[in-house]
């Protein structure tokens, strides 16, 4: 695998390399080969992955046909750092941060 380094920008080249490796499935392969996997365990894992893929495909098909509601998009601003429970900042309240 080869990545060009332009203008001595190593960070950008490293980012490109990681992206290529991710696309090729090298990280997943390394994780799987990190230890020995018995053939029976491999078969069970592959079967579970196939079931997961089939369920995901069926769910997407039902969503496209309108029989299942679409997955709600995340609402930014709620949760950590939202209206409540933050650590001060602008509009923190009458006493401000403690």
Curated annotation (Swiss-Prot):
InterPro entries: Ribosomal_bS21 (IPR001911), Ribosomal_bS21_CS (IPR018278), Ribosomal_bS21_sf (IPR038380)
Taxonomy, superkingdom: Bacteria
One function term, GO molecular function aspect: structural constituent of ribosome
Comp. bias regions, Gly residues: 78-98
Region annotation (Disordered) ranges: 61-98
GO CC terms in record: ribonucleoprotein complex; ribosome
Pfam families noted in UniProt: Ribosomal_S21 (PF01165)
GO aspect biological process, one term: translation
Keywords associated with the record: Ribonucleoprotein, Ribosomal protein
PANTHER family, A to Z: MITOCHONDRIAL 28S RIBOSOMAL PROTEIN S21, SMALL RIBOSOMAL SUBUNIT PROTEIN BS21M
Family matches, as HAMAP family: Ribosomal_bS21
Family of the protein in this entry: Belongs to the bacterial ribosomal protein bS21 family.
Protein name (record): Small ribosomal subunit protein bS21B
